Amino acid sequence: VAESLTGGLVAAEITSVPGASKVFRGSVTAYATELKHRLLGVDATLLAERGAVDPQVAAQMAAGVRKALEADWGIATTGVAGPDPQDGQPVGTVFVAVDGPLAPETGATRGGKTTALRLNGDRAEIRRESVRSVLALLLEQIAGEQTGNERAQDTERNGGF
């Protein structure tokens, strides 16, 4: 997990579930722009030209944390929770991203997606909805790895979803 505007809330949500230690490797809260480059490998030119609130920044944060933590999946949040605009972006502008494992047969990334959000509400509401949105995107990407038949078999084997 790589977090900016959510400041650790995504990691807190994941680790609130018993047994999370079996699947959760860790998180990086890169609130300061320069940490996005230094810790997560986000392109410095991209940050200088577009700022931290950008879809490519979110995608690079997700890929960077996946690599840094040697995880199968990386997720990231970046955006403007308010009360003031940032990097020319209005309050409520959020980008969430997922970066998934490589397909063994092709070496291509299987799960990779960035979503732009325009959220309303106060700072706390924007941050909460950002957490919900990035976790929903991760679930969507993980579920998309399975074909319909595999998913049906998994549901039967495990007694439901």
Language-model features, listed with the residues they occupy:
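Short alpha-helical segments enriched in small residues
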Residues: 1-161
